Each structure stands twice: as C-alpha cells, then as structure tokens.
A protein has these predicted regions:
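Extracellular/periplasmic bilobed ligand-binding domains
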Residues: 124, 187-283
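Beta-alpha junction/loop-to-helix N-cap segments that form part of ligand/metal-binding clefts
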Residues: 26-28, 52-59, 71-138, 208-216, ...
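Extracellular/periplasmic periplasmic-binding protein-like sensory domains
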Residues: 148-151, 247-318, 392-395, 404-408
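Secretory targeting and sorting signals
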Residues: 1-12
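Periplasmic-binding protein-like
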Residues: 100-112, 129-131, 172-177, 227-237, ...
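An alpha-beta-alpha
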Residues: 144-207, 230
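Segments of small-molecule ligand-sensing domains
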Residues: 304-311, 326-388
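Extracytoplasmic "Venus flytrap"
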Residues: 22-62, 84-90, 176-186, 287, ...
Length: 409
C-alpha cells in the first residue's frame, strides 16, 4: 500500500523561532519531546486481514499533523508521526507497541481491532487515542475519540441500532460478527439487549464469521433458514460485503441490513447490487457526504492530498491525531505524558475537529473514561450512492442487560 504521509503538507512548516526554542530548552527532559519537536505514533493494521478496513487511516493522521505543523506546530515544536504496522496480529502488535516505546514516541493514535498491546501501553503510561477497543472505556491513558467504549462491559448495550432497524421494518434479526474483542463483546451485549426492545426477536447468532473476504454461502443459508428479516454485521468491511453478496445469491430478501464501517460509495459499484438498501454506519465520525463544514473541509483536504476520504477508518485516523494535538495543547508548555493524561481527562467538550455527532467528555461517567456516544448519523445505500440521513439520530438508551435497567439515556 502506498504511503502519502509526506505529501499532505498544505504549506511549508514554519521553523520555531529562536526565542521559542530557547524557552522550550528550559523544560525538563521527557520522552518524545525536544525543544524543537514532539514525536507521535500511529499504530494499526497496514497489512493482514484488517488492512482494507484501516486504509488511509495513518495517512489521514499525517494530514492532520501536517496541518498543525503548517500553523507553527505546538508551542514552536514540530510534530513528527511514525507509523507502526501490527499486521493484524496479536504478537506483532505487542512488539510494535514495544518498539514505539523504545523509539521514545510520546503518544499513539491506535486504529486496530487487535487488543494485545493495551496492558503494555497502560503500564508505560503512553497516551493513546482511538476507538472501539475495551481500553477506551477503562484505561486512564486511553481516550476514545467518540466517547467511552462499551466493549469493556459486555452487559451494557445501546438500543440505537435496534430501534433504527425496527423503524425500517425489522422484527427478526440475525446477528453476525467476526472474532475480535470489540465485535464479540458488542454483539454479545446486543444479543442480550433484544429482549428489551419490543417487537424485536433474535432469529440467529453467528459469533465466529471469518475475518475479511470469504465464502459466506453457509452463513447466508443459515440466515435464510432462520427466517430472519434483518441482519446486523460487525467485522471487517470485506467480510460484510461477502455476506451481502452471498445473501443475494441465495435469494434472501431482507427488510434491513446494517454493516458497521459501510462508508465508501465506491464499494457499491463493485458489489453487484448486493448492498442495495443496506444501512451504513461509520466507526463514529459523521458520514463524509453530510452537509457539515468540518466534513467538507476534511474531504477537500484528503482529496488534495490524493487520499480517499471515504475509507472507513480514515476519519478516525484524522480525529485521533487531532485529539493527540488537543491533549498536547492542554498539557502545558512543558508537556509530559502525565500532564497530557491528567489535563485531557478534565476536558468536557471535545468536538472531534467538528467531525463527530456530539461533544465528548473525558470525565468519569457511565464508564471510568466517560459516557459512550448516544448519537449516530446513518447512511443508506441507493444504487451507487450512500445517502446520509437528513439529520443525526440521537436519544439512544443504554441498558444493563443483566438487570434490564436503563443506565444512560
């Protein structure tokens, strides 16, 4: 995969002034920070089965870093972003996290489904931004760009998706997920939640769908025989496409199908109509086609850099870098990892560069790291276009499925 990391600079990076450099030199020595620069990192899947899901994420992160450098950096310090490929592999992810620490990286932007690195990063007190993984709900050093992750507590789930599918006519749902910590935990909770959504019932659960593109014929036949009229899929986008194509081949007509990460209309042009009517959800950012200035600015900047703004994880790479920048700005003139974590934990109105449906507080809430998101902006596949809803959908209720109690609304 080609890297465009150094091609996204919109303007020459101003050099720190002599006065700024002299002032910064008075700061205590700390990992990743010099008087003239700060070293950050992106870690995730550049290769392996998850690679297509995370296409463009590191490049989008580099774009946000370049934009900040073009404005002079942070307190005169230029930002550098290093990329670490976990190869969609648990062992490799740990070694890459250890390498980032050895390289003196100040903090990381994580875009990955693999979760083996989190104890290592927590122990080293490395600030991390990203999404989905359980650590974003519990680990003090981990900051979820769209809020706390529910996957740290498999008993808690949001009614948002089920209510949306119900509004499309769904009554009997098949839940399909591949094996990753986030997908398994989220869909375990979703399965237990169905009983608390009147008019919805579980037709089938497939908890071990293969990762990535695969022959999904057997899954399609199981869904067909279950009598399901709707499907919710969580996994790598290629796996969702495989399932949709197999369902079409088996003549299965659904009232609703949701694929997490369905955000790129280019996919519709190569799927043979299998995704017609599918409900797309991003990984937490607004859809690129929505009429919001920040999304238009992001899309234009990505296009100018020769990058695909529609890639599912690309907006999260950009926002993850933005959150690292936000944390550095609130960490003080002499930033340390600890001041980054302590001060960013006090922020209650982070707006994700204007690219997320609601502002995020990093103060304790339903989870130690705050509240999970209650708003989602959906899109619908029509022909070769993904049409965003006219407005964001909010008001999701979070239910503790072990008790049936509403814990957040």
């Amino acid at each position: 995969m080609a890297f465009a990391a150094n091609s996204a600079v919109a303007a020459p990076t101003p050099a720190p002034t002599k006065a700024t450099a002299t002032s910064n030199a008075a700061c205590p020595v700390t990992p990743g920070v010099t008087p003239a620069g700060i070293t950050l990192g992106w870690i995730g899947s550049k290769t392996g089965p998850a690679a297509t899901t995370y296409l463009g994420s590191s490049e989008a992160a580099q774009l946000r870093v370049d934009q900040e450098n073009a404005k002079g950096g942070i307190n005169g310090r230029k930002l550098t972003l290093r990329v670490y490929d976990d190869a969609s592999n648990s062992t490799t992810q740990i070694s890459q996290a250890q390498k980032a620490i050895a390289d003196g990286v100040f903090g990381l932007n994580a875009n990955a489904s693999t979760v083996s690195m989190w104890p290592t990063l927590k122990e080293a007190n490395i600030p991390v931004t990203g999404f989905s993984n359980p650590a974003f709900g519990t680990d003090r050093n981990a900051f979820g760009v769209v809020g706390a992750s529910t996957s740290s507590n498999p008993a808690i789930s949001s009614t948002g998706l089920l209510e949306k599918l119900k509004s499309m006519g769904a009554t009997k749902i098949a839940l399909v997920n591949h094996i990753s910590a986030g997908s398994v935990s989220t869909f375990n909770a979703l399965q237990n939640l169905i009983q608390y959504v009147p008019g919805m019932s579980l037709a089938l659960r497939i908890p071990d769908s293969p990762q990535g593109a695969h022959d999904a014929t057997s899954e399609a036949l199981r869904i067909k025989n279950s009598g399901a009229d709707s499907v919710a899929y969580s996994g790598f986008i290629d796996g969702g496409i495989s399932l949709a194509q197999a369902l079409k081949q088996q003549g299965v007509t659904l009232k609703a199908m949701n694929i997490v990460g369905l955000s790129d209309p280019a996919i519709l042009r190569t799927s043979g109509g299998a995704l017609e009517g599918a409900l797309g959800t991003t990984y937490g950012a607004l859809p690129v086609g929505v009429n919001v200035r920040a999304m238009k600015t992001y899309a234009s900047a990505m296009k100018a850099a020769g990058l695909n703004s529609y890639s599912p994880a690309a907006p999260l790479g950009y926002i993850g870098a933005d959150l690292l920048i936000k944390g550095l700005k609130v960490a003080g003139k002499c930033p340390t990892r600890q001041s980054f974590i302590d001060n960013l934990r006090q922020v209650t109105n982070y707006d994700g560069a204007g690219m997320i449906p609601e502002k995020v507080s990093f103060m304790p809430g339903l989870f130690p790291n705050g509240n999970p998101p209650r708003c989602t902006w959906y899109s619908l596949a029509k022909g070769t276009d993904l049409i965003p809803d006219a407005q964001v959908t909010c008001g999701a209720r979070y239910i503790d499925t072990s008790t049936g109690k509403v814990v957040l609304s």
